[in-house]
């Protein structure tokens, strides 16, 4: 070979280069496949807090009281209570990464019909205490504290307390009903998965490829928080014997909501909304229909 002339590269060189490239791409793909869900799960452990600001039930012309709830695990939760005028009251549980203002208009509708409404910031959200959000696994403790508060109110009949939850709040509300048969009725919107086992209820093929990565992310949360993996809703819901359920579902929640409505041993009504994706806006999208269905449901079971 003459000086300055580049050496010739044979087939072996290019074959090795191809193998190396394929291996690098495969490793990167695996890291992305498992890494992205874990990164998402880790970021969800410490959600941002959104301030309440100057918003309050007074903006809707409602009288209210500031309340402080204490959970069984000694966290203080802060909220508002709009007194009942008909002897019944509803606990309102907002969605993840929000605060009590996310259920303010639901409270306004309830108050219009005489129902008391207890809105609070769930743990790690708004003004409430809590440092780690473990995918909502412990949020049922917040719902329990809210129910205990209402049972102490002189104007509330302890047998006429309902729970209304949105998205993550829906999961917490539904699970609480599996533990407390004193709840008179449950309205949940956007109810999806509490655990990986619940995710398997979702029959959409698009999820199949992500199942191993999702499973790993759930295990990561258990390891990171030290909080034991909870009972899946699919196992807990059959414990409901008498509490009536109203499940409101858009496309993304249809499979799970349908399953929960069939698994319960109590009365269940499923309102299927022809809306794409994950939705918790029924009150705003269909206000008259929401009022007819939700208030009608509560009137039936809390009368």
Q: What kind of feature is each model-predicted range?
A:
Residues 16-70:
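An N-terminal hydrophobic leader/cap segment in hydrolases
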Residues 72-83:
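A short loop-to-beta-strand scaffold at the N-terminal edge of the catalytic core in hydrolase folds
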Residues 175-226, 238-240, 283:
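Hydrolase active-site cap/lid region
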